[in-house]
Amino acid sequence: MTEKELYKELGTLTKNRDQWEERIPYLASLLSHESDRIRAKALWLLGETGLVHPLSVKEHVPAIASFCGSPAALLRERAVNALGRIGRGSFPVIEA
């Protein structure tokens, strides 16, 4: 799948909130994708999912937090945003 096709697929997933929780493992796997654009979208979706299902994303919090030190500003911003959304859902989930 090309980056463009994958980004479009993630855009479709964005609109289908009922699928978010079941797609968490897939989204987490995209955190290692070569494209910053795809990783940024995955971070955003994990954050939004974590607001509603914080315990379901808990195991992925360390991977999300690792992007706070990324050289890419977009990935740092998305990671901080995701952690904030997850913490809003359940603060203990993001406590170190």
Residues of each region from the PLM?
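Amphipathic alpha-helical scaffolding segments comprising HEAT/armadillo-like alpha-solenoid repeats
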Residues: 18-31, 54-67, 89-96
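N-terminal "cap/leader" segments of large eukaryotic alpha-helical scaffolds
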Residues: 1-29
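Ordered, amphipathic secondary-structure segments that act as subunit-interaction surfaces
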Residues: 76-82, 86-88
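Structural signature of alpha-helical solenoid repeat scaffolds
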Residues: 11, 47-48, 84
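Short inter-helical turns and helix N-cap capping residues of alpha-solenoid HEAT/ARM repeat scaffolds
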Residues: 34-35, 71-73
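Residue-level detector of extended alpha-helical repeat arrays and alpha-solenoid scaffolds
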Residues: 3-6, 39, 76
